[in-house]
Amino acid sequence: MKQYYFPPSGDCGAAFAARLAEMEPDSILNLQSGRYVFRKKDAAAFPFAVSNANADDGTLFERHAAVLLRGMRNIVIDGHGAEFWFEGDVSPIFLLNCESVVLRGFSVHFFCPRVSEMQLVRKEGCCAEFLASADSPFIIRENRLFWLDPDGVPEAPETVIAQSASAEGLRNLRSDFNPVRAAVSAERVGERGILLNFESPFPGMAGDVWQFRNPARNEVGILSDHCSDITLESLTLRFTPGLGIIAQMSAGLEFRKLIHEPEPGRICAAFADCIHISSCRGRFVLAESRFCGAQDDPLNIHGTYLKLERQEGPDIFLRFMQPETWGILPFEQGDHVALVDGHSLVRLEFRTVRAAELEGSHGVHLTLSEPFTDLPEYAVIENMSAYPDAEIHDCRFAGYPTRGILLTSAGKCAIRRNTFIHGSGSPVIYISGDAGSWFESGGVTDLEISGNVFRGSGRSVIEIVPETAESSSETVHRNIRIHGNRFSDCAYPYLRVRNTEDLSCDIPPAFISGSRGK
């Protein structure tokens, strides 16, 4: 392979883009140990639709891709220990329509992460004193605390949500109580100290770390869109905005030896999910990786249900219903799609896609091999071709407030030999599917959950619970094997299940809630 080189630089965005443009297929870009600084002024800015990360008001976010790989084939970026540092509110890396790309051996950092943090130093009566992290700038204006975003813009207290973690970060939960909003006054104490006054005694514990973010996912971490054969290996992600690694309409993804954990002295490493896989196909592998400090699920794998609005012969007209997912086309010519009853999630009929196109921001027009014969009262469409065969093994998941893994894929899937350290009120592994809220499809057909270790779950550890009508007894998930897992300090039940058949499980019946399946 042809060798290219690029040295560390304190302002390398434009030159780095130029070097990428020089690269031919079958080549390697070699970096070296040192700091590579990318600034927002050099980022490629353009509107772009991202699954589960669009504005819920129908406005398409303008993204700022600090490193943009578009249409590249058979290349490797080998960091050799390089540090990528990002200044401003940007998306670190975009891969668009790429094939056979390897990213390895570098780390991702932000000078000012999009999640601000402060640690409770002491409290006395209705007063509480905090120490802001060194990379969380703030101002006090009219006796109120305003965090500054990565572009230096104050975030109104009303726009930020809160999360509270123990000092070591293993307990890391969302909080309905928001100190920034609840404070009746605020004052600066020295360079990084913050004194907040409340109407009643502060409920937190000394040492707790409070985290704050505006939940808009206007930027993401590493995006793979319409790519194939993408490998991420030996990457250290100290912070990612939006969805950490988001792959949509991509095939053949292999992520190995990732460390998605925060900088020393911080709690948060991921603004939302660590990894989000939406409407992908082929093989997905996540192996030998560590995750800690997410504000949402460490791993989410799903397709998308679209509402069937009308049928005209072989032509059907669909609509995205989830407010953050629209403007993408998760169908290709030749795909096999299912007509699904939106209440029971039962697949009723199957057809082949002859043509697919977007219609406006929220619509999709499909031409099918033949019309559906009998439409239910509430119908949604599921793309049976846009599911990966997923393997998740030998990973560690800790310090997150929601599910550890959410998986609704009709491919052949396995979750093996992972460790989950979990203390939230959500299931650790969630096999769901719904056509009423997130619209994340669909029914599992082949899943193994084996050899995992679960520690400290505050709710049912594994939930196989599709969001169907309460009266529905129809099967949604099938062919699931749960064997050889260990549970330590976990709440009852270890397994909650319904609308499932062909379930093989060695969990004692006393620790199971619901039917073991048909």
Protein language model annotation of sequence segments:
Residues 40, 86-92, 112-116, 218-221, ...:
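Short glycine/acidic-rich loop motifs that flank beta-strands on beta-rich extracellular proteins
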Residues 106, 235, 258, 289, ...:
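Consensus "Asn ladder" position of solenoid repeat domains
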Residues 2-29:
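Acidic Gly/Asp/Thr-rich repetitive segments characteristic of extracellular carbohydrate-active
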Residues 172-217, 349-350, 354-390, 398-399:
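Small/polar beta-strand repeat architecture
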Residues 30, 68, 76-78, 85, ...:
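Extracellular beta-strand solenoid repeats
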Residues 27, 34, 65, 73-75, ...:
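The right-handed parallel beta-helix/beta-solenoid scaffold, focusing on the short coil/turn
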Residues 17-21, 38-76, 85-104, 112-126, ...:
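Extracellular beta-strand-rich solenoid/capping regions of secreted or surface-exposed proteins
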Residues 63, 86, 110-112, 121, ...:
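Ser/Thr/Gly-rich low-complexity blocks that favor extended beta-strand/coil architectures
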